[in-house]
Amino acid sequence: MRELSAQQAAALHAQQAVQLLDVREPWEHELCHIAGDLHIPMGQIPARLADIPQGRPLIVVCHHGMRSYQVAEFLLARGFSDVANLDGGIDAWARAVDPTLARY
C-alpha cells in the first residue's frame, strides 16, 4: 500500500484526482476536516462499502495515520485497487498544508 505525504496528497486533492476518505469519529471530523472529504467513521466502513467510490483513487485519512492504514488494508482486501494512506494523518496535513485547521 502506498503512503503519501501531506504535500503529495494535497497536490492530488487540488487536481481533484482523488477522493479523500476520512475515517475519524464524528466529533473529530467536527473539530477539523479537509473540504471535499467523504466522512465514514472506521466502525461503519464494513456496512458502508457501497458508499465508497471504486472508480476513483482513494486516500484514507485519520488523526495520525494508524486507523486509516487499517482501513486502507481492509479496502484493498475487498477489491479496492487504488488506495493510499495519508502518512501522519490530518495532523500532518494541518502542519504542512493548512495551518488554519485545528490540531488536537
What is each residue range found by the language model?
Residues 61:
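Short, surface-exposed ligand- or partner-binding patches at beta-edge/loop junctions that are enriched
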Residues 1-19, 26-57, 66-104:
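Rhodanese-like catalytic fold shared by cysteine-dependent sulfurtransferases
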